[in-house]
Amino acid sequence: MGTTNLTLDSESICDPNYDILFENAIYFVTACYLSVGLFCHISLLKIILISDRKYFKDNSFFVLFRADLFASTTLLLYDIFFGRIFMYIPQLCPFVSTFFSTPTIFLKVLYVAQNHARFVKSLSQIFMVLNRMSCVLMPATYNQFWNKITPIASFIMLILPFAGLWNIMISQVIASSVRGGFGVDYIKAVKWASLSLFQSICILTALGFTIVCTSVTFYKLACLSDRVRSIERSLCFTSISISCTFLLVAGTQLTFATCASCKTDAMYILQFLAFDTFNVGSAIIMFLTNRHLRSSMFSSQKKRAVTVVTVGQISTNTYN
């Protein structure tokens, strides 16, 4: 099927009717909490993959959680340095939008990466709640079971999102008007295969798993508190807390899928806030609920401080 490249000008993309100061204030506020989330995610990745790798590498939950961390980090980087900055800083729109007036590979790669990460977030949610449920249902064989399943789960999280992204990959990805700036959209090459359809299927499937698995986990924790180790119990409560943030995403996605009149500016902002809570919240919740991660982070900071002081003392002694 042949396609003709679409060319847009900045006047058709940029809307001058939005208050610049108000839009900039929205970006400043969102960039602040997204930056906190990005710092927490990078810190977690450093602890899990580098500084305390021996402790976490054999824990199947943290292997699954790594995928969530990478996906969230991708989304946070995209939002801070591209998505939100060009949406909420309208004064940039006339200059920057000219670079994206025609479909480009760069824009397509960004859009695919962003939405791949969103699919991974939903899929990792499914596997994490399954992991916690199996921990309380079969504590004796849980480790052996997930040692076999985790590589398969990791492969699924990497590959399955492309089942919902293939239409983007063959379509024209363009800049589109969003508030006073611009965002990224696409012209469907295959009309029925919309991204929102595939995302809704994935999110609603994850919602079903989340409700069932979290309910079972919560119930069994009350019954088997003596048979579940404290660290596993802590991870169960972590998973339950992350699931609560996912419910916000599922709720807004379900509203968009079923209510055509709800697609207003306020609802779009509410959807962004729901995704932000899910993206930022997972790392913050993990730090708040996991004592070992907190101690690892603070101990590494203390080591750096001691190193700086020691080096300073050596330098002083040398010059004396």
Curated annotation (Swiss-Prot):
GO biological process, one term: sensory perception of chemical stimulus
Similarity section: Belongs to the nematode receptor-like protein srg family.
Organism: Caenorhabditis elegans
GO cellular component entries: membrane
Statement: the UniProt record of this protein carries the keyword Magnesium: no
Record key words, sorted: Membrane, Transmembrane, Transmembrane helix
GO molecular function (one): transmembrane signaling receptor activity
UniProt cross-references to Pfam families, sorted A to Z: Srg (PF02118)
Membrane topology summary: Multi-pass membrane protein
Transmembrane segments: 25-45, 80-100, 155-175, 192-212, 237-257, 268-288
Protein name: Serpentine receptor class gamma-17
InterPro entries reported for this sequence: 7TM_GPCR_serpentine_rcpt_Srg, Nematode_SR-like
Cell compartments where the protein resides: Membrane
